[in-house]
Amino acid sequence: MDKNYDRIIFPERSYDFVAPREQFVENMVSYFPKEEKAIISYMDLLDQVATNSRSYFTNKALPGILGTITYPFMTRKFFSYSDRTTFDVLSGLTSDQHLIGVLTGQWGDHGLPPKQSSFAMHAMVARHYLDGGNYPTGSSRSIAETISDLIESHDGVLMVNAGVDEIKIHNGTAVSVIMENGDEIEADTIISNAGVVNTIDRMLKNGNGHSRLIDRLEKVEQTKSYVCLHIGLNKSADELGITNTNLWIYPSYDHDKNVQDYTNNPEADFPVVYVSFPSAKDQAWDENHAGYATMEAITLSTWDWYTKWQDLSWKNRGQEYEDAKTKLSDRILDIVFEQVPGIRHAMAYKELSTPLTVRDLANYQKGEMYGISHTPDRFRQRWLRPKSDIKNLFYT
């Protein structure tokens, strides 16, 4: 991607996040010249989190007694960062609320505003961008295609449109997977990448320690949902002057207040509108789609706003639902047109996905954005590790 990977936009001005690391620091200091010391300290903290996260995550892979014995000293330093919120840590570096608002302008990448998110999560996301953003040639589908080739080359078998109904447990051991059509596939090792909530709540039936696992789910919370406006354009990105810089558009620097105001009143300003340009990021796009471009505009949402339609099937939710989508789409477009005015007369297609869409197509039951929220408490849950409490069952 371009070196300017993100642009953080507020009503009166914008701030560019530019790679490499040295340029990022130079830009931040130019925006906030009185805060150079705080900015340098912030960069150092990002590195400290990265360093200490290695032993924390390594411990999650250690078996049994070895993991238990080493747990205290392999996690202690990481917890000194993960136990604190992002806002708490940054407030210890600076009192400049605008600087804090800018540095946390990517909060949508992990789903929680700074007063709720673990600083460790913020740091891992922010630091990984410092050398620039990357995008797979051929779009995200090329990742799946590459992985599938590798699996099949080792005699693996891939099944699509094959829903799982249950992971069968016998005497405390995962022994097979029962498909929605009734087929049973036996296996010595079962790995679920459906997320712990889906795995425990939907695939493990009563008994076999299920109640204990359900109790553990009460110690974590699911992330909020989102809506995404998918836009198709009948001109190329070059013709429209579109770059591949992501846009983060905010009504104010106080992200937590923005989220709270919108959650309380869906007619309030959007807490964030994230605009990205997938086709402009894909180096292979023009090979098959010359003269066209795509965009996405995403904002926060809540499952509760859509429960009245939850029992209606996809594409058959009625006129009220379609009218609500149209109204929301128009509001999002008003924000998008302010920042990317050139696309107004090139729109050939638009479609809004809602939390119900996420449930139906991605199987997140409340349309979650990222599964489990990245709060400080989340990182204290020792049971969130690859090896589950059930023999032969693993989580990704």
Region roles according to the model:
Residues 234-356:
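C-terminal segments that line or cap access tunnels to active or ligand-binding sites in enzymes
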Residues 55-62, 152-158, 170, 238-239, ...:
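Surface-exposed helix-capping loop/turn segments at secondary-structure junctions
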Residues 96-110, 270-274, 333-396:
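A glycine-rich dinucleotide-binding beta-alpha-beta segment and adjacent secondary-structure elements
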Residues 91, 123-183, 188:
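Helical element adjacent to the flavin cofactor pocket in flavoenzyme catalytic cores
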Residues 1-5, 94:
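N-terminal FAD cofactor-binding segment of flavoenzymes
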Residues 102-134, 388-391:
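Active-site-adjacent "gating/activation" loops or surface patches in catalytic cores
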Residues 11-116:
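Rossmann-like flavin
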Residues 165-289:
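Mid-domain catalytic core of redox enzymes
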